[in-house]
Amino acid sequence: MGTDGLVGVVTRAFVVGILELGSIGVALADTTILNVSYDSTRTLYKEFNAAFAEKWERDTGETVTIQTSHGGSGKQARLVIDGLEADVVTLALEADVDAIAAATGKIPANWKSRLPNNSAPYTSTIVFLVRKGNPKGIRDWGDLTKEGIQIIAPNPKTSGGARWNFLAAWAWARAANNGDEAKAREYVAQLFKHVLVLDTGAWGAMTTFVQRGFGDVLLTWENEAYLALEELGPRNFEIVTPSISIKAEPPVALIDGNVDNKGTRKVAEAYLNYLYSDVGQKIVAKHYYRPYRPELADPQDIARFADLKMVTIDEFGGWQEAQRKFFDTGGIFDEIYMPRR
């Protein structure tokens, strides 16, 4: 995705997880804030940062520089825990924000209740990206374990999107087997035997599939799949929407301990609140996320989203239970995944 300048913000993309600095002259900025985000929000925040910087200067007479950092959500959370002084985080799942809160004490336990919709201004889901013509005939989750199918996906240990992938696959298998958890486990174990490359984040997985040409199918965020079509054209790829997926709810949160130390609370709070504004919700939908308030978005942007059955994290007991059961050290993912040799 390009590095062309935007109003108020010019983004320079570096290695995944490294800072992307947005400014038109840092020396001119009254305030600088850092948004630590996950892989799939790059184009979203490129435009949103520009819109917010323009509004902030118009409303206050002050300029603001917005820095962004992107990478696998779990890795990003670890960077903040290890001392990266984020003003806000916009991560892939609440378990990563909870991990920061527990490890640092810089976010209050009630952080989810401070913004609407449990602090999720947008949602997404998991879909399949296949090559043009769908040569392997992939229509649903059951097709992914057929002989010869090669899957590209990110790693649940480092990527939030990968954890949503895992749970969506589990939900389908559980439903297909009348709620049988053992059968669901068996299916997901078989699915991961078909994973050719397990990248650290969604961005890396997309690159492996789209640019390097590996694999028959990519398990990916819905917005990433649409971006691939936008950037590379529908002549190369197709989106397959499975019969069941999951409602992915990426949350946003203020890092109270950091903003109070840096004196940036006012601008950081305004930044997160602006995601819920009519402008913010339009930008969210434009970049293929499902806005919390779809009535504020352009109707043509909403119309492109497929109607599908989506389970929620509540069906797994919430993120705390899902993280413990599936993704923590010694959890089900560790038990079933055997890296290719």
For every predicted segment, state its role.
Residues 133-139, 158, 171-179, 258-266:
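Short helix-loop capping/hinge motifs at secondary-structure junctions, enriched
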Residues 29-158, 302:
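N-terminal segment of the mature folded domain
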Residues 176-243:
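Ligand-binding pocket segment of bilobal, Venus flytrap-like solute-binding proteins
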Residues 36-38, 130-132, 150-177, 192-195, ...:
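Short beta-strand->loop
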